[in-house]
Regions:
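Active-site environment of divalent metal-dependent phosphoester hydrolases
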Residues: 14, 40-44, 75, 104-110, ...
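Short, well-ordered secondary-structure micro-motifs
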Residues: 45-47, 79-81, 110-112, 146-149
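Active-site adenylate/phosphate-handling loop in enzymes that bind or generate adenylated species
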Residues: 90-133
Length: 251
């Protein structure tokens, strides 16, 4: 069984940005691992220290994913061997074919922990030949520097994604975890990508956006990439169609 590993700084990062895509991959036979580097406790009442761990466990359970936990301090991640080592261990131990992580934004627009994790994952992943697809997600609050070049329609998994996000009750006050905000993001990427075939029970189009950091042709891909007509480059022997660095749709 092929494995997909999602590596993120905090509990709720993956839920917000790629749980629909992870659900799609699981439905097509992938083992899905969600790795959280920090304890996520910054700004949280110490008396509720166990809440974030439990919330992450519940969220992954909603989707049937396996949860991996790191123990580095929330809010103080630095690009260093201390961060690289646990990520390298996960990749060595689980040998993922697909890795998903934060977008690396050198301008520092995103959360500093996200930037550090993204840089560390890129460092490790580009040294591991077994990783055939490396995707970076949209920053939680959006960023003008984020230019996705692939989109995934995740309507079939939208309800479970929202249920997983709702597990993070300690973070319920944050605007970017509100259903309306999540829907607005999805609507925007649906418009940008030209997606027009709703798959969700609510009749809406639900889209997640990614930037491809690494892509190799491989026959076992669970994602079929459909590009705009003027940018198509297909491999007839593979489900994965390699995209050029320009927006297109994943069906």
């Amino acid at each position: 069984m092929d494995t997909v590993l999602a590596v993120f700084a905090h509990p709720d990062d993956a839920e917000l940005t790629c749980f629909g895509t992870l659900g799609l991959l699981k439905s097509r036979g992938y083992r899905v691992l969600v790795g959280i580097i920090t304890d996520g406790l910054a700004g949280l009442d110490p008396a509720r220290a166990t809440d974030r761990v439990l919330e992450a466990q519940l969220a992954s359970a909603v989707m049937g994913f396996e949860l991996l936990r790191g123990a580095l301090p929330d809010g103080d991640l630095q690009y260093s061997s201390q961060l690289i080592v646990p990520i390298e261990k996960w990749i060595r131990d689980y040998q993922p074919a697909i890795v998903i992580t934060h977008d690396y934004d050198p301008a520092g627009i995103d959360h500093q922990d996200h930037i550090a994790v993204a840089r560390a994952v890129l460092n490790v992943a580009h040294r591991k030949p077994g990783i055939e697809l490396l995707l970076q997600v949209e920053p939680s609050r959006g960023s003008r520097s984020f230019e996705p070049n692939v989109f995934v329609e995740v309507g079939a998994f939208a309800a479970n994604k929202l249920a997983a996000i709702a597990c993070h009750k300690s973070q319920a006050h944050k605007d970017y975890l509100q259903p309306g905000y999540i829907s607005l993001r999805s609507d925007w990427w649906a418009a940008v990508s030209g997606t027009s075939s709703p798959l969700a029970a609510d009749g809406k189009i639900h889209v997640e956006a990614f930037r491809i950091a690494r892509s190799l042709i491989f026959g076992s891909s669970a994602l079929t990439f459909t590009k705009r007509p003027d940018r198509v480059e297909e491999s007839s022997a593979n489900l994965l169609r390699l995209p050029h660095p320009r927006p297109r749709t994943v069906a």
